[in-house]
From Swiss-Prot:
This is UDP-N-acetylenolpyruvoylglucosamine reductase. Its EC number is 1.3.1.98. Belongs to the MurB family. Gene3D superfamilies: 3.30.465.10, UDP-N-acetylenolpyruvoylglucosamine reductase, C-terminal domain, Uridine Diphospho-n-acetylenolpyruvylglucosamine Reductase, domain 2. It comes from the Bacteria. It is an enzyme of class 1 (oxidoreductase). It comes from Bdellovibrio bacteriovorus (strain ATCC 15356 / DSM 50701 / NCIMB 9529 / HD100). It catalyses: UDP-N-acetyl-alpha-D-muramate + NADP(+) = UDP-N-acetyl-3-O-(1-carboxyvinyl)-alpha-D-glucosamine + NADPH + H(+). The gene is murB. HAMAP family: MurB. One of its GO terms (biological process) is cell wall organization. One of its GO terms (cellular component) is cytosol.
C-alpha cells in the first residue's frame, strides 16, 4: 500500500474533470484500512471513497485522503432450490460482473448491463435501468467501519433503498466503506422486457427471449444512445426521473399527449430526458459542457470542463424544466 501525494484523478472520473487529490491510496485488503487508521496524521484527514468515478462530480482540488477500493473477486457462495447466492468484491467492474453471472448461467442482473462503475458503488446509488434496480436482488452488503476498521453486515432492509438512494448515500455516507456485495439471484427466470425498446430489439434480431439476449439488447440500446466516456466525458444519466403525483402527471398529459411516464408505486415516474428535450436542451451547449445530442438526459464534457461548469449547466437545465413543466429534476451524481 502506497500513499501518493498530489494525485491526478482526471482519468479516474468518467466526466474527465480536472481534479487533484491531496493524498491518494488504493486498498486491496481490510488490513490496508487498519494500517491507515493507525496513522494519526492520515486518520485525522477528511476521507473520500472512490469507486469507478462514474457517478461523481469532482472539484479541481480535493483536500484530504482519497481511498480507491481495488479488491477483486467473484464467486458462487451458496445455492438452494430457488436461488443462487453470488458474492462480488467492491472493486470489480460492474458490467464485467454482470456478464460473468450470465456466462455462469445465473440471471437476474441482465437489465443492468453496461452501467458504468464498480460493484461497491452499485448499492450506494441503488443503480437501476429498464425496470430493474440493484435492491431487487441484493442480499447483503459487507462493509468496513471507517472509524474503527470493524466489519459490519447490512441486510437488504438495513440498506434503506429507495429510488437512486440508500443508507450509504444518506446517514451512512462517509461512515462505511463497502467491501463486498452478495446477490440472491432467482433460479426461476423472470424477464423484464417492458421498459424501453428491449422487446423491440430482441424481436428485431429474431433472438430467443432469454437473459443473455436481453443483456445484449440492453447493451445495443445503451451503446446507440449513450456516449462512451473514454471518448466523450460523461456520467451517464445526469438527472433522476422525477416522481410525481397522479394529479400532476395527468395535468401534464392533458397538455402533452406524448409525455413519457411510468407507474411507480402509487405515483408516476416521468422521463427526465423527455422533459429536458422539450425544454430545448438536447444537443445544446453551455461553455465546455452540454446535453448529449442523442440522449438529452446525459450531460457531456466537450473538453476542459470543471465542476463549476457542470453545476452551472445543471442548474440552468433544471430551472428551465421547472419553468416549463412545474417539475423539479434532481442531479443524480454525487457532489464532492
Amino acid at each position: 500500500m502506497q500513499i501518493q501525494n498530489s494525485h491526478d484523478l482526471s482519468s479516474s472520473n468518467t466526466l474527465q474533470l480536472r481534479s487533484l487529490a491531496e493524498r491518494f491510496v488504493e486498498l486491496y485488503t481490510p488490513a490496508d484500512l487498519s494500517t491507515l487508521l493507525m496513522n494519526p496524521e492520515l486518520k485525522n484527514l477528511p476521507w473520500k471513497i472512490l469507486g469507478g468515478g462514474s457517478n461523481l462530480v469532482l472539484p479541481s482540488q480535493i483536500e484530504g485522503l482519497v481511498l480507491k477500493v481495488s479488491n477483486l473477486g467473484r464467486k458462487l457462495i451458496h445455492e438452494d432450490p430457488d436461488y443462487w447466492f453470488v458474492k462480488a468484491q467492491a472493486g470489480e467492474v460492474w458490467n464485467d460482473f454482470v456478464q460473468w453471472t450470465l456466462e455462469e448461467g445465473y440471471w437476474g442482473l441482465e437489465n443492468l448491463s453496461l452501467i458504468p462503475g464498480t460493484v461497491g458503488a452499485a448499492p450506494i446509488q441503488n443503480i437501476g435501468a429498464y425496470g430493474v434496480e440493484v435492491k431487487d436482488t441484493l442480499w447483503e452488503v459487507h462493509a468496513l467501519d471507517l472509524q474503527t476498521g470493524e466489519p459490519r453486515v447490512f441486510s437488504n432492509k438495513e440498506c434503506q433503498f429507495s429510488y437512486r438512494d440508500s443508507y450509504f448515500k444518506q446517514e451512512g455516507a462517509g461512515r462505511y466503506l463497502i467491501w463486498d456485495v452478495t446477490f440472491r439471484l432467482p433460479k426461476k427466470n423472470v424477464l423484464h422486457l417492458e421498459y424501453g425498446d428491449i422487446r423491440k430489439e430482441v424481436e428485431r434480431n429474431n433472438w430467443p427471449q432469454d437473459p443473455r439476449h436481453v443483456a445484449q439488447a440492453v447493451i445495443n440500446i445503451r451503446q446507440s444512445k449513450l456516449p462512451d466516456p473514454k471518448v466523450i466525458g460523461n456520467a451517464g444519466s445526469f438527472f433522476k426521473n422525477p416522481i410525481v403525483s397522479k394529479e400532476l402527471r395527468d395535468g401534464l398529459l392533458s397538455k402533452h399527449n406524448d409525455l413519457v411516464s411510468f407507474p411507480y408505486e402509487d405515483r408516476y415516474k416521468l422521463a427526465a430526458g423527455w422533459l429536458i428535450d422539450r425544454a430545448g436542451w438536447k444537443g445544446k451547449k453551455l461553455g465546455p459542457v452540454g446535453m448529449y445530442e442523442k440522449q438529452a438526459l446525459v450531460l457531456v464534457n466537450h473538453g476542459g470542463a470543471t465542476a463549476d461548469d457542470v453545476w452551472k449547466l445543471a442548474r440552468q437545465v433544471s430551472s428551465d424544466v421547472h419553468t416549463q413543466f412545474g417539475v423539479e429534476i434532481e442531479a443524480e451524481p454525487i457532489r464532492w
